[in-house]
């Protein structure tokens, strides 16, 4: 029976089936967006949804909430050369969203990393790592957009909490098969880099993308 919950670990478990190149993608620090742009000729973000919803139990605990509250939830695909590379799921502590993450409302199809890694007030907690089965809620959300991925038994994922002022933001990144075949660029380091201007934000939005942001 497949698990609906993921076991998150402080370190990526050693597994001979995970090639070194894949481990570099999964464990690399700094801005993942910058690394994706370095590894592709064209990069863009497709926003799938942005609306309040209840986070998973392990998510609201990771944010330090004492009970579940509807949180601003943003889901996007990071696309390299017109092929989805990463599914990103972000939830924001609703108590401090407007004060500490004011840019989130107008982000649209721009990358979150472009705002996080240029702000010296943002701090990032250490990564946690997991493998998500097709029954996991985040896999289910992904598979509604990319149903072919339901045949993948496990997809590697990582998450970390970003902090700014009193606010917390949990970002989970699910690595898709196409990305893991690409050569991983050099690590940008813990602080990340200022992002190059090579992002296509002028594409036709889906109906989900046209929903007003909350």
Curated annotation (Swiss-Prot):
Composition bias (Basic and acidic residues) maps to: 197-214
Task: Tell me which UniProt keywords the record has, alphabetically.
Answer: Cytoplasm, Lyase, Pyruvate, Ubiquinone biosynthesis
In terms of one coarse class, where is the protein primarily found?
cytoplasm
What's the EC number here?
4.1.3.40
From the Swiss-Prot or TrEMBL record, state where the protein is found.
Cytoplasm
Q: State a single Gene Ontology molecular function.
A: chorismate lyase activity
Query: What Gene3D superfamilies has UniProt attached to this entry?
Result: Chorismate lyase-like
| Involved pathway(s) | Cofactor biosynthesis; ubiquinone biosynthesis
Q: Which GO terms describe its cellular component?
A: cytosol
Q: Detail which positions bind substrate.
A: 74, 112, 173
Per UniProt, the enzyme's principal EC class comes to lyase
Recorded catalytic activity of this chain's protein? chorismate = 4-hydroxybenzoate + pyruvate
Question: In which domain of life is the source organism classified?
Answer: Bacteria
Task: Name its GO BP terms in alphabetical order.
Answer: pyruvate biosynthetic process; ubiquinone biosynthetic process
Q: Does the keyword Cytoplasm apply?
A: yes
Asked if the Swiss-Prot or TrEMBL record annotates the protein with the keyword Cytoplasm, the reply is yes
The record's section on InterPro entries has: Chorismate--pyruvate_lyase, Chorismate_lyase_/UTRA_dom_sf
Q: Where is this region: Disordered?
A: 183-214
What job does the chain carry out? Removes the pyruvyl group from chorismate, with concomitant aromatization of the ring, to provide 4-hydroxybenzoate (4HB) for the ubiquinone pathway.
Give the family, as the similarity comment puts it. Answer: Belongs to the UbiC family.
This protein is called what? Probable chorismate pyruvate-lyase
Source organism: Cupriavidus metallidurans (strain ATCC 43123 / DSM 2839 / NBRC 102507 / CH34)
Gene (name only) = ubiC
